[in-house]
Amino acid sequence: MARSTWKGPFVDGYLLKKAEKSRESGKNEVIKIWSRRSTILPQFVGLTFGVYNGKKHVPVNVTEEMIGQKFGEYSPTRTYYGHAADKKAKRK
């Protein structure tokens, strides 16, 4: 179920502060964040965020196409190694 439009997008408060500090300083450093649930806003375009996936911070460069999506969508948490091969079929 989608979020109600009257509530507006969810963004953690500390994330807005970090983005504002980064814009003021002018440095293009990776902003480490743990809030995968936050929505990407237009003021984040051009910034690089390190989104935590449970193990490390995955760098995400925000573009205009990403606006309205969640940060967690760009930092996968599970590693897929493929299905295990059938050992009986390998012997033949």
From Swiss-Prot:
Entry similarity comment: Belongs to the universal ribosomal protein uS19 family.
- Write out the entry's keywords from A to Z: Ribonucleoprotein, Ribosomal protein, RNA-binding, rRNA-binding
* Source organism, top-level taxon: Bacteria
Q: Which PROSITE patterns match?
A: RIBOSOMAL_S19
Gene Ontology biological-process annotations: ribosomal small subunit assembly; translation
- Protein name as catalogued: Small ribosomal subunit protein uS19
Q: Which HAMAP family match?
A: Ribosomal_uS19
Q: Which InterPro entries match?
A: Ribosomal_uS19, Ribosomal_uS19_bac-type, Ribosomal_uS19_CS, Ribosomal_uS19_SF
GO molecular function list: rRNA binding; structural constituent of ribosome
Q: Name one GO cellular component term.
A: small ribosomal subunit
Q: Which organism is it from?
A: Cereibacter sphaeroides (strain ATCC 17023 / DSM 158 / JCM 6121 / CCUG 31486 / LMG 2827 / NBRC 12203 / NCIMB 8253 / ATH 2.4.1.) (Rhodobacter sphaeroides)
Q: Which Pfam families match?
A: Ribosomal_S19
Q: What is the stated purpose of this protein?
A: Protein S19 forms a complex with S13 that binds strongly to the 16S ribosomal RNA.
